[in-house]
A protein has these predicted regions:
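Short, basic phosphate-binding NTP loop
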Residues: 1-111
Length: 112
């Protein structure tokens, strides 16, 4: 998975949208992959990152206004976008989407 993330973020500006459980997990994998140009975290609530790993923090009610300032946005599943996903210029991805990029041929869906 790290190889897919590394390729996706290489030399790009990256935003983590939502800093709950999945956002923190994305932050760990992005740091592990490295190679990004800049990183930021956007969340409705005030957040902090651990020392030694600086990231620009965008917090408050307008936290979604910045999406098109970034090349790649890692969106947490609980975040409802303010606009249709196709109205953004940035590439918006999720952990689930990256999982299917990597393991899609090995997955079988079972319903009801």
């Amino acid at each position: 998975m790290i190889d897919i993330i590394r390729e996706l973020i290489k030399d790009k500006s990256v935003l983590i949208l939502g800093y709950g459980r999945e956002g923190r997990s994305s932050w760990q994998r992005i740091k592990e992959a490295g190679g990004y140009r800049q990183i930021a975290i956007a969340d409705m609530n005030q957040v902090q990152t651990e020392e030694g790993h600086p990231a620009r923090l965008i917090c408050g009610p307008d936290y979604q206004k910045c999406l098109d300032d970034f090349d790649v946005v890692f969106k947490s599943p609980g975040i409802v976008l303010e606009k249709d996903i196709h109205d953004y210029r940035c590439e918006i991805v999720s952990q689930t989407e990256l999982f299917f990029r990597r393991f899609g041929r090995q997955c079988i869906g079972i319903t009801g």
